[in-house]
Amino acid sequence: MAALITQEIGSFRKPEYLSMEFHKIEGTEKFKELAERATIDTLKIFENTGLDNVGIGGEMYRWEMYEHPAERIKGLIFYGMVRSFDNRYYRKGSVIDKIERRGSFHMDEVEFVAKSTKKPIKIPITGPYTMMDWSFNDHYNDRHELAMEFARIINEELKEIQSKWPYISNGRKLEIQIDEPATTTHPDEMDIVVDSVNKSIEGIDAELSLHVCYSRDYRLLYDRIPELNIDGYNLEYSNRDTTDLGVEDAKRPGFQDIKYFNEVNESLQRKKFIGVGVTDVHIDFIEPVKLIEDRIKYVLNIIKDPELVKLNPDCGLRTRSRSIGEQKLRNMVIAKNNVLKDIS
């Protein structure tokens, strides 16, 4: 793997020509036309910033990470709106019967992005634990059973993508990111996280990463790394950090627990990579290149192999304007290049 690969996590603010019409036209030819146009426009932004991996083009086909797959699942109905973050809302579903896919969640999006860029792409998909945690359960016996049922249908989705990937990959490896923001919200349910995530990726031959953000305690996750069949972890750190310059512990409080990640990783025969959140997606402040450089250098003082470190925003950038999101990504790429020069 190359050193300090730069990547987007997933979402990016939609252009107004799509966002203002999204719910009115979803499922129509007009939606397809505008989603494709928005994807092309966003891929151009990502490519112009110099990103190594352009993700799925900013998730232009998806309104929200829970609602998008939930709308495509039989046995689940919606009751009303629930606030998630930054005054953003999603429709919370209730599972009232055995759940099954109505059709693919993401195949049309994956096929279009794959043919629209030559860059590596990474396909985010909301994980089984988060789907379970963000749903009401009015059918299954308990939370573990429901999580495993979500894992079953996510596994079906991933196997469909995997089966078609050789025909659209243009020689690129398949990269899948399981989005699990709910991972550590219930510390006593980490067994459910491990069981359901592993079930969801069973039989999938790809580079598999897990994205978690705004965790109460990442150590709960780090302790289970040996049990998870995951290749790497794309995590949020900058939101809990200062904006002071420097590579001392006191200047980089948000990155302290990477030391524990490294301890766990060093005990493994097959090392995991870590995608480090070096820009905060919940503020408009555009991190100066020097600040991002210091965050990267701090991490490399802990994890000595730069090929085990990827760089990304904390989370998806959909909460920021497109211009601010673009500048955050651009500064991240410049910082990466400067650090590589320093360590070469």
Swiss-Prot record:
Molecular-function annotations in GO: 5-methyltetrahydropteroyltriglutamate-homocysteine S-methyltransferase activity; zinc ion binding
GO biological process: methionine biosynthetic process; methylation
Keyword field contains Methyltransferase: yes
Claim: Zinc is one of the keywords in the record: yes
EC number: 2.1.1.-
Top enzyme category: transferase
Transmembrane segments annotated in the record for this chain: none
Superkingdom of source: Archaea
Cofactor: Zn(2+)
Positions contributing to Zn(2+) binding: 211, 213, 236, 315
Keywords of the record: Amino-acid biosynthesis, Metal-binding, Methionine biosynthesis, Methyltransferase, Transferase, Zinc
Protein's pathway: Amino-acid biosynthesis; L-methionine biosynthesis via de novo pathway
Record note on cofactor: Binds 1 zinc ion per subunit.
Pfam families xrefs: Meth_synt_2
Family: Belongs to the archaeal MetE family.
HAMAP family cross-referenced by the UniProt entry: MetE (MF_00288)
Alphabetized NCBIfam families for the sequence: PRK01207.1
Function: Catalyzes the transfer of a methyl group to L-homocysteine resulting in methionine formation. The physiological methyl donor is unknown.
Protein name: Methionine synthase
Organism taxonomic ancestry: Archaea, Methanobacteriati, Thermoplasmatota, Thermoplasmata, Thermoplasmatales
Gene behind this protein: metE
